[in-house]
Amino acid sequence: MADRDSGSEQGGAALGSGGSLGHPGSGSGSGGGGGGGGGGGGSGGGGGGAPGGLQHETQELASKRVDIQNKRFYLDVKQNAKGRFLKIAEVGAGGNKSRLTLSMSVAVEFRDYLGDFIEHYAQLGPSQPPDLAQAQDEPRRALKSEFLVRENRKYYMDLKENQRGRFLRIRQTVNRGPGLGSTQGQTIALPAQGLIEFRDALAKLIDDYGVEEEPAELPEGTSLTVDNKRFFFDVGSNKYGVFMRVSEVKPTYRNSITVPYKVWAKFGHTFCKYSEEMKKIQEKQREKRAACEQLHQQQQQQQEETAAATLLLQGEEEGEED
């Protein structure tokens, strides 16, 4: 279900194809190599695994398989010296494979985003078939887009539609750093009909193997409505600390920013500063308008007095002539 344009990647750099995602024990590509896949999602026999004994340092903890249409998806929880992580492998009808790698904290956020996509998909109307055959090859804008950025990895999520139906395209890119080659990328496409089943399988693995931490005590979220927009303020936490996600939502548009807790005070101070400055500017504008109105009234009054004096003088002159 490959598609060409991406709402979440507009303006982004071009991406390479294939490529391994640097966890020990992963295969060297999306083809028939190596020892990275877990459970049923393991790749074919033969080479491509990590050299030496490095592969044995990665332990597989659990694996789930989800069948959607003519595709198989494998979700494997693994663990190595760096911690636990999740590998997602897509195997198409022709045996082609694509893999994504997520830390467990990113997997939690990814699960939450899947919930948003599921809700959005449920609200969409029926798919509209192309009127012309050539329309099948024309790129269509994303129905909904989101993205995650974590360290050197970016995850782009686009709910899209083509002649085969609607699907969620997920692209992961890994920036190897300057001098280490171009950005590498891997992409999977989830048919929209299977999003709930996939999300539930992912949620089960997170519940069973996610890092167990005491839930942080955080303030409840709030929202406010301005004209036809609504702003949501949601406080969350992850391994990087506490943050606030500020979302701007319109009927056909949604955008959000994430503000770390350590800069909340600065953000608040900046908003207050500009609020006070705008009050002063608006007050000056009101005073200026009031002064202009007062001057206009004075000029009008002077004109009226001048006109009255002129009429009076004309009357006196006419009386003297009589």
Swiss-Prot record:
One of its GO terms (molecular function) is RNA polymerase II transcription regulatory region sequence-specific DNA binding. Signal peptide: none annotated. Homodimer, heterodimer with PURB and heterotrimer with PURB and YBX1/Y-box protein 1. Interacts with FMR1; this interaction occurs in association with polyribosome. Its main location: nucleus. PUR repeat II repeats lie at residues 142-213. InterPro entries: PUR-bd_fam. PUR repeat III repeats lie at residues 215-281. This is a probable transcription activator that specifically binds the purine-rich single strand of the PUR element located upstream of the MYC gene. May play a role in the initiation of DNA replication and in recombination. One of its GO terms (biological process) is dendritic transport of messenger ribonucleoprotein complex. Residues 1-55, 295-322 are annotated as: Disordered. PUR repeat I repeats lie at residues 60-125. Residues 9-52 have a biased composition (Gly residues). It is linked to Neurodevelopmental disorder with neonatal respiratory insufficiency, hypotonia, and feeding difficulties: An autosomal dominant disorder characterized by severe neonatal hypotonia, respiratory and feeding difficulties, encephalopathy, and severe developmental delay. Additional common features may include seizures, exaggerated startle reflex, abnormal movements, and dysmorphic facial features. The modification Phosphoserine is found at residue 182. This is Transcriptional activator protein Pur-alpha. Belongs to the PUR DNA-binding protein family. Residues 295-314 have a biased composition (Low complexity). GO terms for cellular component: chromosome, telomeric region; cytoplasm; dendrite; glutamatergic synapse; neuronal cell body; nucleus; postsynapse. It comes from the Eukaryota.
